[in-house]
C-alpha cells in the first residue's frame, strides 16, 4: 500500500523506503568517501522522517559512481567486509534499520576483475546477505560474474529477502531462483539510464507476478554529464500490480507498506495462476501430483553446460571490445 499510511509502521508487515540517490560524479577517492557520508546521513534522516521504517534501500553505484575510466582502478574498489561496510553497519545499528547498499568489490583473486556486490545489513549491524551480480550488463560492464548464487535471508515483518542488481532483473530465471528458495520480497537496485526505463518497470511487475512475491526496486536519479538516470522507484504487489511509483526526482524517497504474509498466503491458497507451483506440477488435474519434468530444453542444456542459441554463431557482439575492453579475459584496468 502506498498512501499517507506509508509514513508509519504497519501493524503487520513493514515499511520500506527506497532512496532515489543522485547519480554520483566520482573522480577521486575523496568523492567516494563523500558518497558514503551522504548515504549514512540520508539513512539517518530517512529514519527520522519515517520513524516506522524498517528497511532502507540505496541504488546500485550509489557508493562508487560510474566513472568508467576509473571504476576498475584499485583506488575505487572496496573490500566486503571492510571499513566502508563497517560504517554502513554502524549506521544501521544506530538507526535500528535494515539497509541495502551497493559496492564494487575487490576480487580476492587479483588476476580477475572486481565484483559488483550488494549487501543487506540488519539492525544489529551484521551483514546478513552478500550477493555478487550474476549478470553484469554486457558489453558495457566489466564486472566478474558473481559466484555466490542467489542467497535469501530473513528480513523485517516476516519477509524473506533477496537482492538482484540492475540487469539481473531482466533475467526471469533469477527471480524464479529467489522465489524457489523462499524469497517473498525481491529487491532490485539499479543504475540504469533512460534507454531501458519502460523495460525496467515492466520486469519489476513481471518478476512479482510470475513468482507471487513483492518487488521493491530503486534506480539512481539525475544527470552525470553523459546519461540521465530515471529514478522511478517502484513497489509491486505479488499480483504484479504497481503499489507505489516514484518520479524522476533525485533524492525522492519512495515508501510503501509491505505485507509478506499476504504473498505467503497466495502461494499456499491460490489454484489458478499459482505458476511457480505449476511449473513443477504441470497437469496435476489429469495426472495426480502433476508432471515434474517441464521438458524444457534450455534448462537441461544450461544445467549440462551446453547452452547455445540457434543463432549464436552469427552474433555480432560477444565481447567488450565495442567499449574498449580487451578480449583476452583476466584482470585489466588496474
UniProtKB/Swiss-Prot annotation:
Top enzyme class: hydrolase
Question: Which EC number(s) does UniProt give?
Answer: 3.5.1.49
* Gene3D superfamilies noted in UniProt: Carbon-nitrogen hydrolase
Pfam families for this protein: CN_hydrolase
- Gene Ontology molecular function: any one: formamidase activity
Q: Which reaction does it catalyse?
A: formamide + H2O = formate + NH4(+)
Annotated active site? 60 (proton acceptor), 133 (proton donor), 166 (nucleophile)
| HAMAP family assigned to the protein according to its UniProt record, in alphabetical order | Formamidase
Query: Which PANTHER family does UniProt cross-reference here?
Result: FORMAMIDASE, NITRILASE C965.09-RELATED
- Record's function text: Is an aliphatic amidase with a restricted substrate specificity, as it only hydrolyzes formamide.
Q: Which family does it belong to?
A: Belongs to the carbon-nitrogen hydrolase superfamily. Aliphatic amidase family.
The protein's name in its UniProt record: Formamidase
Please give the organism: Helicobacter pylori (strain HPAG1)
Q: Taxonomy-wise, where does this protein's organism fall, top ranks first?
A: Bacteria, Pseudomonadati, Campylobacterota, Epsilonproteobacteria, Campylobacterales
